[in-house]
Amino acid sequence: MVKCMKPGKAVILLQGRYTGKKAVIVKSFDDGTVEKKYGHCLVAGLKKYPSKVIRKDSAKKTAKKSRVKCFFKVINYQHVMPTRYTLDLDLKNVVSADAISSKDKKVTALKEAKAKFEERFKTGKNRWFFTKLRF
C-alpha cells in the first residue's frame, strides 16, 4: 500500500476543535506507538487565517491582517483528509512530541511556527493553504 500521509502533505482536519482547518503533517506514525497503537500523525495547522488585505489599508492595519495563529496536534489518520497539496515548510526541528507535552516548550515552539507560517504567507507561496476553507 502506498503511504500518502507523508511529512509536508497538507491535510484538512475532520474531527475535534479544529474541524475544517488546514494543517501540514510534521511527522507520521504509520504503525502507531506504545501509547497510541493506531496510525496517527503530528500536525501543525492554522487556528486563525490571515484576513483579506486591501490597497487602502495602512501599513499597521496590513501587518495586523497578515497575522496567523497556529496549533499543534497529534491526530488519528481517520480524522484527517489528505489533499493534493504539499508544503515544503521545515517544521521538524521546531515541533516535536516532547514540545507538545510541556507548556513552556510548546509556547516557544508555537512562536517559531507562527513566524515560519507568517513568513511563508508574506512571500506569497502556497496561497491555497492560507485561505479559509469555505463550506
From Swiss-Prot:
PROSITE patterns with a match to the protein in the record: RIBOSOMAL_L27E
GO BP term, pick one: translation
Record Pfam families: Ribosomal_L27e (PF01777)
GO cellular component: a single term: endoplasmic reticulum
Keyword Cytoplasm appears in the UniProt entry: no
GO molecular function, one term: structural constituent of ribosome
Top-rank lineage group of the source organism: Eukaryota
Keywords recorded for this protein, A-Z: Ribonucleoprotein, Ribosomal protein
Family recorded in the similarity comment: Belongs to the eukaryotic ribosomal protein eL27 family.
Record-linked PANTHER family: 60S RIBOSOMAL PROTEIN L27 (PTHR10497)
Protein name as catalogued: Large ribosomal subunit protein eL27z
